[in-house]
């Protein structure tokens, strides 16, 4: 099965890009893009005022540049928590935007690859041997969203009121995934 490569938000599968213009609300705050949230998280515990500057940046590229300005230190545990921060914001984006959720679910079981020519951690890098961590997280979240959709189908198709109530009281796979990610982030502090 041919993998799906994505990079720019205007290209096919652009919803997978953190630069796609899909606002994300997390922790009671709204961000222009998932990139804004990710970059904001580097600074919120160290310098909340500077984190707010990042959040209000007019573009995701500007948010990235501000967050990576060495004159403003990032939280010291960033390398340990960055993957879970990405998991959290990617989950929020795809739960909050039905168009993105439909798009990622439509990719089936195909491998998702961030075709970044410069980033060999989040993407495949110039030589296509990078870690592709964003692609891995997207596929992980896709699996959670698929489980969520299956649970909703069971609830919608339940024939007895008691069975329907029991199903409806189960935590959604997405909520459980978020709880686990937040628990890991809480222990990292």
Segments from the language model and where they lie:
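Charged, low-complexity intrinsically disordered segments
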Residues: 1-189
